[in-house]
Amino acid sequence: VNTAVHQTLVVQLQAGDTADRFPVLAHLGYEAADPFALTVVFSHDGRVLARWVLDREMVTEGLTRAVGVGDVRLRPESRGMWDELRIELLGDHRADGDRHRAVVFVWTAAVESFLRETHSVVRPGRERVCVDDFLAELTAEG
């Protein structure tokens, strides 16, 4: 039985205040041990640009409607004949007081395919977290 799903996608990154997009890799990960989370590592030319942990249900909802407040916001967008998931990520504060910002566009069909694979590992509504293990981990890091 698979307990993990990994997939690498080419996505479009729009960084800063420009409308220009450029391709980067998004390495998606899902582990049954952390059933609510999706991990995304963005890289370009072999260099890690950022690592984010996203809520699986939020990503699913973001395919059909705008969701999120704070650091992560998702919404569906159409670009010509393509349907995309727009992921806005807000980072640390810059010297001028604004926050670092990146927008990533992912082909909707690729996200849906990845989510289907995660659902075959842990079905939505069947997620479980062992509280005792979680508390033991927290106190060990203490």
Residue ranges and their predicted role:
Residues 37-47, 56-67, 112-116:
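Short alpha-helical interface patches
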Residues 1-39:
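Charge-rich, low-complexity N-terminal segments
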Residues 19-21, 44-54, 94-103:
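Short, surface-exposed beta-strand/loop "edge" segments at domain boundaries and coil↔beta transitions
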Residues 34-36, 81, 99:
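Short, well-ordered loop/turn elements at secondary-structure boundaries
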Residues 19, 66, 71, 76, ...:
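Protein-protein interaction regions
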Residues 92-93, 98-142:
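Mixed-charge, glycine-accented linear interaction segment located at domain edges/termini
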Residues 50-94:
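Short, internal acidic amphipathic alpha-helical interface segments
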Residues 41-46, 88-94, 108:
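Secondary-structure transition/turn motif
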